[in-house]
Amino acid sequence: MTTDLWFDPTQCLVGGTWRPATSGRTLPLINPSDGSEICQIARGGAADIDAAVTAAQAALDGEWGRMPAFERGRLLTRLGRLVLDKVDELAAIEAADVGKPLTQARADALALARYCEFYGGAADKIHGETIPYLDGYTVYSLREPHGVTGHIVPWNYPMQIIGRSVGAALTMGNAAVLKPAEEACLTALAFADLAVQAGLPAGALNVVPGIGAEAGAALSAHPGIHHISFTGSVATGALVQQAAGKNVVPVTLELGGKSPQLVFDDADLDAALPFLVNAGIQNAGQTCSASSRILVQRGVYETVKSRMAEAYGALTVGPARDDLRVGPLISNRQKEIVTGFLNKGADLTIAGQGILADHTPDTGAYVRPTLFADVPADHTLARDEIFGPVQVLIPFETEEEAVRIANSTDYGLVASVWSRDGARQMRLAKKLHAGQVFINNYGAGGGVELPFGGVGKSGHGREKGFEALYGFSQLKTVAAYHG
């Protein structure tokens, strides 16, 4: 696939210059649809991270640090237009790299462009305020960048998370060092190339591919970093926070989830059904905000089970290029993890299951989407994050029981309520432990304007919307005494 790329994937972007890893080493990038090698990527390490941080600081001390907010906004808007011009190419790259069906990959590319547009327009709209105080004082606050920000981006949604994290950081005038996941980093490199084309000053954005335990660990612990943004597993997120904590650096964590949808007897089932299924199988279930638990009130439980089982039976899994609703998992390692969870469900009833396309390569990382029914709320499959196309149906009797079950895991990223009862909608919006609660929908179309983040082991801090811009800035108070 290397001939289809307009950039060299074996390079890092450091200080506006494309260069190989200091060690000269590379890594193979594997296509999860068939197990073939796509290309080689740079295996950056601590030396490359150090060079990137130095370049980022130099950018802050130079042109980038002096650039007015409206000019930063123009750059991001220009970058968004370049992304739009490359939507189809970016989608094809992401489909090969992540195994994501083309339609889903294209939606991610459009979302990346939208982040650039939104943040480009917001760049000069964030400001401090004047504060009434004692006679003889003028007091005001300033919004300033943290400085050099580190961004560790996962493999499941590279473009979307680069947009919401790196895009927001650049908007506020930070200089970014991006470490993409070694399993899927091509669109990160493509974004960097487009940023250079857009005119982003040297060092404002630096990209160092590499292994998490090498480049990622070096970035988390680097004393020249002033803020870390991490999306990934709970275990790795804890390590990132510990490393950053030694330098007293703030961290935004977006981690795992076990997000429930609560379906009540009065729900509009025709409206709910597509969301119930799609929220669990999108990107083969490899979504932090995936809805892996479907809680259904007894009065409609059998109907929901039957209709979801029918929907699962209509699912076909195949290579990303076939653009089916479900593609492969990211790797055979992830396939082993998901298969292990499926084996733990041997004591459960399978209500519905998808099929593999006839031509699906044996070397691909495929699993059949699986719906389990009548699952106890304390079962492993109802409590642990699986990160695959697996959903569990859990019956409940009362609203109180539904809330108790929904809040019974360590996570709190997303929840959804399906009910026509307005009072119930408002009660549950408050009672559910989640960073986002959706009423009669799931995800709200993924709008870039909507703050996103979790509670509990789903992490802390907020990305997307204006909240992300506040998070990528720090407040300074100025009090002038003039008598």
Report residues per predicted region:
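Glycine-rich loop-to-alpha-helix module at the N-terminal edge of alpha/beta enzyme cores
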Residues: 36-126
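Terminal low-complexity tails and localization/encapsulation signals of metabolic enzymes
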Residues: 1-41, 74-78, 126-152, 252, ...
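Residue-level signal for inorganic ion chemistry
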Residues: 35, 72, 94, 116, ...
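Rossmann-like NAD(P) dinucleotide-binding subdomain of oxidoreductase/dehydrogenase enzymes
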Residues: 128-271, 323, 396
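Conserved C-terminal structural/oligomerization subdomain of aldehyde/semialdehyde dehydrogenase
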Residues: 36-39, 225, 262, 316, ...
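Structural signal for hydrophobic packing residues in well-ordered secondary-structure cores
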Residues: 60, 64, 80-87, 91, ...
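ALDH superfamily catalytic-core signature
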Residues: 227, 235-376, 439
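A structural signal for short, well-ordered beta-strand elements
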Residues: 28, 42, 65, 98, ...
